[in-house]
Amino acid sequence: MARAMDNAILETILQRVRPLIGQGKVADYIPALASVEGSKLGIAICTVDGQHYQAGDAHERFSIQSISKVLSLVVAMRHYPEEEIWQRVGKDPSGSPFNSLVQLEMEQGIPRNPFINAGALVVCDMLQGRLSAPRQRMLEVVRALCGVSDITYDVTVARSEFEHSARNAAIAWLMKSFGNFHHDVPTVLQNYFHYCALKMSCMELARTFVFLANQGEAFHLDEPVVTPMQARQINALMATSGMYQNAGEFAWRVGLPAKSGVGGGIVAIVPHEMAIAVWSPELDPAGNSLAGIAALEQLTQTLGRSVY
């Protein structure tokens, strides 16, 4: 590294970005998320050799929301041949809001990528066809990746999302009309919302995703999570499509593959070195953590890290 990592660096970064708190907005279209305290701020790092660093609210669990889309893709990659996945979902950035219907209609029910809602729903539809208990299987995968046995779903958040699921249901039914959705829509929606309602901390997320920094291998697991090629492909998708319609702006400012969620979390990858997780619930207009992006920008500048 250009500079040795320690917790003091992370503490300093949080101090620098804390003035941004109050300038964003906590997600309120999901009532169960609207009550989260907007002043929360945490960051954690897990290196490929198992070193951990943290600052702020790094051990407080929150709803990971769309960060889970990476995990569902990982599970799909372990159960489906590559060609079966990518004939149903694309690999290109959408440039549209994550819950857009317009582009999906124009492109005959094939989502642009697996990290927008439509693409993630297709992936969940695929998992429904291969896994006997998709929700339990996801918990098993996440617990193994994280090394923590009590990771679970926030059922209140999952229920709240299902009760306000009209738009996601419309997306699923639209894809079904084009023949790109094969299973019962409410069942798949329930799985999808449970995945989004996983509760994890920054430290747990950094440990979970460190395999993407190490060619698909995690320091604490005996078997690879994915192949080196699959890890590279996932990182590429995160770089182009992981930050909704602001992927270009994020690449400009931060320069790392990343995936965000409207719970305020962001996971970013420094290939061959580390996974970083940040959390600040207040969002920018695109649905990304306002202070979280600023913290990652400060960190990459401090360490001199970018994939570009």
From Swiss-Prot:
Statement: the UniProt record of this protein carries the keyword Hydrolase: yes
Broad class of enzyme this protein falls into: hydrolase
GO biological process, one term: glutamine catabolic process
InterPro entries hit by this protein: Beta-lactam/transpept-like (IPR012338), Glutaminase (IPR015868)
Subunit relationships: Homotetramer.
Stated family: Belongs to the glutaminase family.
Record-given protein name: Glutaminase
Organism: Salmonella agona (strain SL483)
